[in-house]
């Protein structure tokens, strides 16, 4: 069986304000297979988000390699990244457009990584689908399709972030706290 994620000897070193090096990830290796649920535990500043950023291909490692579906994640185009992985951030404001409505944010998530265009026409075409999906999740979002997300509660924003991350049914879902 081929691993969905292959993390080999990942090292991430950063420099602080005094030009001193700090090791954030130290020789981390991990294979994740289809249907695996992996929990990464650690205190604040332990490197969990750094690890997720590396897996997502948004933060280069100092050394080591990360492969998703057999391909080096650093070579992924935005389209390929959107196809294979999705993410929910610690802060539910990240990855969303606060002044846009719930429905508009869901539309962006649905077509993330694809060519832009036809936004208003697509929104009306998908509103019923989003309504049905939201009703399954609950958390009061079904009443807020036309509400800018800056007016949602923290829990509703987090539920929206999770819904946005799962819309494309990615191979890999990264949940950061």
Regions found by a protein language model. Give the residues of each.
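A short, proline-enriched helix->beta-strand linker immediately N-terminal to the Walker B motif
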Residues: 165-171, 177
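ABC ATPase NBD coupling module
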Residues: 18, 60, 72-86, 94, ...
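Conserved ABC nucleotide-binding domain
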Residues: 133-151
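Q-loop/switch helix immediately C-terminal to the Walker
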Residues: 99-115
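Helix-to-loop junction immediately C-terminal to a conserved catalytic motif
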Residues: 56
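Conserved ABC transporter NBD signature motif
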Residues: 64-72
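The feature captures the beta-strand-to-loop junction immediately N-terminal to the Walker
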Residues: 41-43
């Amino acid at each position: 069986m081929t691993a969905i994620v292959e993390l080999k000897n990942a090292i991430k070193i950063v420099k602080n304000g005094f030009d001193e090096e700090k090791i954030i990830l130290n020789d981390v290796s991990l294979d994740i297979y289809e249907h695996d649920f992996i929990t990464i535990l650690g205190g604040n500043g332990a490197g969990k988000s750094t690890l997720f950023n590396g897996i997502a291909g948004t933060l280069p490692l100092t050394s080591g390699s990360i492969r998703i579906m057999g391909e080096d994640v650093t070579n992924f185009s935005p389209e390929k990244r959107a196809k294979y992985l999705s993410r929910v951030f610690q802060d539910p404001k990240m990855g969303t457009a606060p002044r846009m409505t719930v429905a508009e944010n869901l539309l962006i998530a649905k077509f993330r990584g694809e060519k832009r265009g036809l936004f208003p026409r697509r929104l009306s075409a998908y509103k019923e689908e989003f309504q049905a999906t939201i009703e399954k999740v609950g958390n009061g979002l079904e009443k807020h399709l036309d509400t800018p997300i800056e007016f949602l509660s923290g829990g509703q924003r987090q539920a929206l972030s999770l819904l946005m991350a799962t819309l494309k049914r990615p191979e890999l879902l990264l949940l950061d706290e």
